[in-house]
């Protein structure tokens, strides 16, 4: 089957923003104008096409990245609508990983908000070219210039308006296109009928000045424009557009447009900007991959072997397990086999679907640049490489996800629900790499862990609604970590020899702090002091012990372990004996290694009216918070940014509401781990005394 759209006519884009900036409403308008839907659903009425989960419709927020394909200006748009709530930044992270470009949506009244910074930082990490859409221009306090300035000031973004608004707030009636120097007026109807009008006389000088500034801003990216400016020659519209595109593709230059999606003004011009300035799969660097120890790149072409990355797994009530994947090269036909080179497993692709939020169309093939969904894959999870079987030694660059920072005990409401609960949690964990669950060995309780209170609320809600599992939930708990602060050489012996086949394992291991590098195991055994076949068991013993900790039952992190000596017994040595010996060595080293507890520190942004500034600052200080920044927003509100331990943040929403008479809001996300003060650490260790198991012979 021939390709319907050329690869250069693809736009794989994400729509990202702070919560409530109007991102889903904007996506709805895009779908309406591109003919994907024939009735507009409003987010605040719980009717949005892209917010398809019941929880999303009730809460008016986007939780999962819904994917859809639309068409505009002769181009094919694969659009992913991402959540703006910080508890769901993993959704943003994994969609940015597979997108080529993005639209950042700002609220014209607030400009850059705390979560804007988070998603902007994520997009910068992945080098994603962006355009900015300043939405809600009809809102009281809307200010296009101040919003653009907030991009420069708060994000350090090289942002340049390519439009000028005609009027603001209730008087926002139209837009001047600075590239073409044309003005448009909107009728505000869903069809967004635009009428070209003369540029209003009172805005002509400003528009001319802004256009000159725009042309100068792209001259650094285009020599011809630079020469034309030096020679004071006129620059053609085509050249300006080409230069803006080139600048945008560098991911260091950000065109800014404006509108009000809810009032149907400016969305079509934003669509034009997506088509004109955001990249096709051919405009971005080839996909990086690993072959053995070396690195290779895979060009975006149908003629290459098939390669793709699974970026989302979800359970669909009608078709079962769905795996979303982005195709980087080659062609895949349904009914064929692929190799999951991350897991080392073969997968059969029985059905391929093209998704629109939660509705689906069966298709026969996917090609380079496509985003598809496969049904019923058995082994594939988020971040896995799916590749042509002849190239099974190639793995695409993976995604890294943060570990959970908050946990809750969960008990099935009845005995019957127990088995269903286990299956449901298994499915939810397969969908979401930042959600984990395990059984507490001491109490036998099931523990669920995630990125925040809302994250776990949604999980519990989904258990009840989707899986029909009722469960009782305990109070949220902090997920502490343990680490070592000193180096030491520690012996570990496991010996049971009392007639018959005994057990014998003997190791010497040097432990060293390994900040931010996780667990590292080094084998320095020489002369066969410990046979090779037991080395893996020693590493496994250490890993298993690190999972349950050596101080207070929390995972031990950032340790380098070098196995340098030991001995063995020809008859009694076994894999199990060495595993236990390694575990004992680590427990024995608890004191000499200076083991400490670490607590998760959250990056918190509190938005309040000025009147409450003193009270809120005092409260942050009482919570062991360190204020790192304080600024005044476009609308006069204060934004206080601080690092605060997670343990001090439970119930903060209620207290902030009461402190600010309901006018304060906050957002927080995990930032780093820090050593817990000694007095608090002692309390926790004492409380969890029963959790620390000392290995005994």
Swiss-Prot record:
Domain tr-type G: 8-282
InterPro entries listed in its UniProt record: EFG_II, EFG_III, EFG_III/V, EFG_IV, EFG_V, EFG_V-like, EFTu-like_2, G_TR_CS
One GO term of the biological process aspect: ribosome disassembly
Coiled-coil regions, chain positions: none
HAMAP family: EF_G_EF_2_B
Family: Belongs to the TRAFAC class translation factor GTPase superfamily. Classic translation factor GTPase family. EF-G/EF-2 subfamily.
Name of the protein: Elongation factor G
